[in-house]
Amino acid sequence: MDLRQFLMCLSLCTAFALSKPTEKKDRVHHEPQLSDKVHDDAQSFDYDHDAFLGAEEAKTFDQLTPEESKERLGKIVSKIDADKDGFVTVDELKDWIKFAQKRWIYEDVERQWKGHDLNEDGLVSWEEYKNATYGYVLDDPDPDDGFNYKQMMVRDERRFKMADKDGDLIATKEEFTAFLHPEEYDYMKDIVVQETMEDIDKNGDGFIDLEEYIGDMYSHDGNADEPEWVKTEREQFVEFRDKNRDGKMDKEETKDWILPSDYDHAEAEARHLVYESDQNKDGKLTKEEIVDKYDLFVGSQATDFGEALVRHDEF
């Protein structure tokens, strides 16, 4: 599907969404849950497996023998030990957990990378991205499908330049990831806020007032009463979003809204795994300590079978 087809589809989806005025649009970027399992090690280590590996990868370990599981875990530990000092710290484990949870992002980047690295030099320049994404627009600057492609291209170029740390208009894979998924990078958060404000700020005064805030998430349907969640959002705006009580949100207030400082579940899980596995209590883990507790980190056919026995007995 090319960009034109995608945007036409997006237009239809948008129109469909607007026809459902009680549906709420969520602009807030939350950290994803580490697992949808209950975190209760007395019952099972399923939560820990999902957190450490990601839910999909965790399923593959359930098919392995204990020996295979330990061998594969040992290889993972070598990747987690970023400074190669033979130990895994809480910070290294936290970084790994965050990577495992966001593996889908890197898979998305890999898919898009192949379509934009046109000269296959391991980099994506702005020219390559522009030509691959907007090439036909340059040939036909006034398409009749209602989208302002030039404006979209200007916005993309601004974001590309922000992601491009060294300013050479050529993105490494990490910079390209920041371009495609800016909410995942601290240095890109200002552009996320700026783009959000541009989307919502209809009168162009550089702020988001109450009506713009509500109008972005709710399309009023004639004489129908507002749903309760809209009334709640009005109260949220007045009581919490508009911190200085001037009737509108500035950049900092918008940032606090869409990029909240959530509880760091990855760090909490990393500390839990270290605490449970650290046999000599030195605050860090060796490969041997991790592999000895393989059932906590990754599981196998044996741990899965044991869990099944527990559930059968309970039944």
From Swiss-Prot:
Xref: InterPro entries: EF-hand-dom_pair, EF_Hand_1_Ca_BS, EF_hand_dom
Glycosylation sites: N131
Record protein name field: Calumenin
Organism field: Oryctolagus cuniculus
Chain positions recorded as Ca(2+) 6 binding sites: D278, N280, D282, K284, E289
Tissue-level expression: Detected in skeletal muscle (at protein level).
GO CC annotations on file: endoplasmic reticulum membrane; extracellular region; Golgi apparatus; melanosome; sarcoplasmic reticulum lumen
An MF annotation (GO) of this entry: calcium ion binding
Annotated residues for binding of Ca(2+) 3: D164, D166, D168, E175
Binding-site residues for Ca(2+) 5, renumbered to this chain: D242, N244, D246, K248, E253
Signal peptide start and end residues: 1-19
Keywords, in A-Z order: Acetylation, Calcium, Endoplasmic reticulum, Glycoprotein, Golgi apparatus, Membrane, Metal-binding, Phosphoprotein, Repeat, Sarcoplasmic reticulum, Secreted, Signal
Positions with a binding annotation for Ca(2+) 1: D81, D83, D85, E92
